[in-house]
From Swiss-Prot:
One of its GO terms (biological process) is protein catabolic process. HAMAP family: ClpS. InterPro entries: ClpS, ClpS_core, Ribosomal_bL12_C/ClpS-like. It comes from Corynebacterium efficiens (strain DSM 44549 / YS-314 / AJ 12310 / JCM 11189 / NBRC 100395). The gene is clpS. Involved in the modulation of the specificity of the ClpAP-mediated ATP-dependent protein degradation. Disulfide bonds: none annotated. Belongs to the ClpS family. It comes from the Bacteria. Binds to the N-terminal domain of the chaperone ClpA. This is ATP-dependent Clp protease adapter protein ClpS.
């Protein structure tokens, strides 16, 4: 008995996206909102001392809060951003967090 060569099998043309984005792996954002209480110089100072920004970057973020009403001042893992929000609250700033996306 003679065996015939097996026929080639076709591979399905499937592309797998290895960079699938789900809500679980999106970063969290710390947002500082404009308020009528804190002076611009104080907000700049808090961004420098609490978040470690340079004077120039802290001033840019403060101006964004002042002119646009809010600014994203940090991002990352949920626990880290929660910590940043708490520190900003202790300093008297209005800060919230939300997941990117």
């Amino acid at each position: 008995m003679c065996s015939s060569p097996s026929a080639p099998t076709a591979e399905p043309d499937v592309e797998m996206d290895v960079h699938t984005v789900s809500s679980e792996n999106l970063p969290w954002l710390c947002i500082v909102w404009d308020d009528p209480v804190n002076l611009m110089s104080y907000v700049t100072y808090v961004f420098q001392t609490v978040l470690g920004y340079s004077r120039k970057r802290a001033n840019e973020l403060m101006m964004q809060v002042h002119t646009e009403g809010k600014a994203v001042v940090s991002s990352g893992e949920k626990d880290k951003v929660e910590g940043d929000v708490k520190k900003l609250h202790v300093a008297g700033l209005w800060a919230t967090m939300q997941q990117a996306g």
